[in-house]
Amino acid sequence: MARGPRYKVPRRRRREGKTNYYKRYTMALSRKPRFVVRKSNKYVWVQVIEFAPEGDKVIAAAHSKELEKKYGWKGYGNSLPAVYLTGMLAALRAKKAGIQYAVPDIGLHKPTKGARVFAAIKAANDVGLEVPVGDVVPDESRIRGEHIASYAESLKNENPEEYQRRFAKLLERGLKPEDYPKHFEEVKAKILEDYKVEQPATTG
């Protein structure tokens, strides 16, 4: 509802909470590719995008659905480990296209320390695509899914029925949640092998 003669109606995507146009404008001024991370309740997708007068140009992209279809991922599509792997996949494709540097674009996500979106940015840096990020990245244990495995192990011992109910989808896919870190490493190795990249040294 209008609030006076000087009130300016925000653009539709800003009203819908999809785009911060001021942030987008400042990124455009940098003339650097953007490392874009977006997520839904079920999936995450990462794109490396260049600004162009005729419209944004997608240089590389990856969706967490690909992890399942191409690399045998059995975990959740929007879990922290899946975000990392999706970011890694997009970054490797960007590097293959000749991109060496990008600015982070997390949209309207709050820059909370340890947030899932920063797992994708950490993955990019781990494989050699420079994307500036501070000390907000999740720690290595959470990226590997150790928090999921630990909780599952505890729940299995204390309440087997609740364990079966809560992790029903994973168990149906043939993944014991206690094996999340092992499964993460297996899928990560497949992605790196696919792009002929040696296992990167990880940082905490």
From Swiss-Prot:
Entry keyword set: Ribonucleoprotein, Ribosomal protein, RNA-binding, rRNA-binding
InterPro entries membership: Rbsml_uL18_euk
Transmembrane segment boundaries: none
A GO cellular component entry from the record: cytosolic large ribosomal subunit
Keyword Cell inner membrane part of the UniProt annotation: no
One biological process term in Gene Ontology: ribosomal large subunit assembly
Record carries keyword Ribosomal protein: yes
Family annotation (CDD domains): Ribosomal_L18_L5e
Pfam families reported for this sequence: Ribosomal_L5e
GO molecular function: 5S rRNA binding; structural constituent of ribosome
Source taxon at top rank: Archaea
Family statement drawn from the similarity comment of this UniProt entry: Belongs to the universal ribosomal protein uL18 family.
Described purpose of this protein according to its UniProt entry: This is one of the proteins that bind and probably mediate the attachment of the 5S RNA into the large ribosomal subunit, where it forms part of the central protuberance.
Subunit structure: Part of the 50S ribosomal subunit. Contacts the 5S and 23S rRNAs.
HAMAP family per UniProt: Ribosomal_uL18_A
Protein name from the UniProt record: Large ribosomal subunit protein uL18
Species this protein is from: Ignicoccus hospitalis (strain KIN4/I / DSM 18386 / JCM 14125)
Primary gene name: rpl18
